Design a protein with these regions (language model features):
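RNA-binding accessory domains that recognize and position tRNA/RNA substrates
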Residues: 12-246
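Glycine-rich beta-strand-to-loop/alpha-helix junction loops that act as flexible
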Residues: 253-257
Length: 257
């Protein structure tokens, strides 16, 4: 039997507004959570990989606009996340796919956003928004299902600036842990036969690495482990003395917000 999963994107349609601090506004409809959120407006030109973007700790504090016109067509799955939760403050798209169809999908994008209290807005002229941000630069913004356009602009103007915010501290691991996650081998599975994929065999770990978590992505950890490193992940505030006491062969500094 086929393992293809197709989920209808059923969600409550509510009018929503995206407002920028310079007074520019865009109308649309919300999906996922409702309410009001603020963050720095930015854009991403990737044609795929929206789940990785949403869960990338580098986007903490930001409202991300996707320039690709159709988003959500393959749903959300457990393997593609870059962290344990979403980090975007809001998500702006042109059109939400009416169907999420993939044998790997476990829930729709609106369901995922509802679960994690993330506000999405669709129906926005993302081309016009992106051109505006490209020329004017990143700026504070607000998405709301409950404020007027003028109120949303004021909310954006009164929101916190990115400068001086310690997004690393809030997103770093609170406990030291060893990474032992496996990597999928997507060339082997045959979905039509019910086989949903295999994991690559992990090689023997020959070297010990300590990785500072400044907003590290799971895929970085997967690649390090897959290439023969035993990886211990530590909080961003861990002292050099504590690191040296672990006697590592190397130290890895992750990227982050």
């Amino acid at each position: 039997p086929s393992t293809v999963r197709a989920h209808c994107q059923r969600h409550l349609h509510m009018k929503a507004i995206l407002a920028l601090e310079d007074g520019r506004t865009f109308e649309g409809e919300s999906f996922g959570h409702t309410g009001t959120t603020t963050g720095e407006a930015c854009f991403n030109t990737s044609m795929t990989g929206y789940q990785e973007i949403i869960t990338d700790p580098s986007y903490r504090g930001q409202i991300v606009t996707m320039t690709y016109p159709l988003i959500g067509n393959y749903g959300i799955n457990p393997e593609d996340a870059e962290s344990s939760q979403p980090h975007v403050r809001g998500f702006v798209i042109g059109e939400l796919s009416p169907v999420a169809s993939s044998w790997r999908s476990r829930q729709t994008l609106p369901e995922y956003f509802s679960e994690h209290n993330v506000i999405g807005i669709e129906g926005v002229d993302t081309r016009a928004l992106t051109k505006h941000l490209r020329s004017a630069g990143a700026m504070r913004s607000c998405i709301s299902t409950e404020l007027s356009a003028d109120e949303a602009v004021k909310a954006a103007q009164n929101s916190s600036l990115m400068e001086g915010c310690d997004f690393v501290k809030g997103g770093s691991t609170s406990e030291t842990y060893n990474w032992d996650g496996e990597s999928r081998d997507w060339t082997i599975p045959n979905p039509s036969s019910g086989q949903e994929g295999n994991y690559r065999e992990l090689p023997e770990a020959k070297y010990n690495i300590v990785a500072y978590d400044f907003g590290i992505k799971y895929d970085i950890l997967r690649h390090l482990r897959q290439n023969g490193f035993n990886v211990k992940v530590v909080n961003s505030c861990t002292s050099a003395e504590d690191i040296l006491a672990m006697n590592p062969d190397g130290v890895f500094l992750s990227n982050g917000p």
